Amino acid sequence: MGKHIVPRSVLLFITLSMVWTLRPTSAGDGGDDESRIQRGFDIAPVLLDLKGKNRALVGLGSYIVNAQGGCNDCHTNPPYQNGGDPFLGQPKKINVDHYLAGGMQFGPGVTSRNLTPDATGLPAGLTFDQFLNVLHTGNDPENPGELLQVMPWPVYGNMVDRDIRAIYEYLRAIPSAQPGP
């Protein structure tokens, strides 16, 4: 059998192809913050007030709240508009009139909190440090010494502060709303 000689140009091509395949993720391929930020803006169900806000954190916060956190399911009452409940096989339509305004009952004495900005612009009426404390510890800001029930704060407590900051910044950007019926 004859020798197979591979031209250097082919070897170079193969080597570069392997290096390209092993490269770290980059913008636009779904593995970076930029694509999550853009997706967050794409899926935000309400108009956002970006004035004076960190745009990147707002977009990332929207992504976490709307694509990962499922916050709407408990903090919007009802979560979906009539005819828009995906759990009933209907095309999803978020209840934007009461979006994240709380009011969902989970038994006696347990009602989801309004996360929208209060009159001073603070989400749920909390400063960032208070919000961070709630998500890390589960301490109920309205009832000191008590832990939040139903809210999955033990899971959110594992998040890095930057992601919690992004959630907070997104909540600052959504419109204020009142709880549903």
Predicted regions, residues:
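Bacterial N-terminal signal peptides that target proteins for export
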Residues: 2-10
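Bacterial N-terminal signal peptides
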Residues: 10-19
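Bacterial Sec-dependent signal peptides at the C-terminal "C-region" and cleavage site
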Residues: 20-30
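Electrostatic cytochrome c docking/interface patches
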Residues: 36-66
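Sequence/structural segment immediately N-terminal to covalent heme-attachment motifs in c-type
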Residues: 54-79, 84-99
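C-type cytochrome heme c attachment motif
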Residues: 63-76, 130-136, 165-169
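Electron-transfer interface patches adjacent to heme c in soluble/periplasmic c-type cytochromes
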Residues: 90-134, 154-164
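A cross-kingdom feature marking solvent-exposed beta-strand/loop segments within repeated
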Residues: 143-155
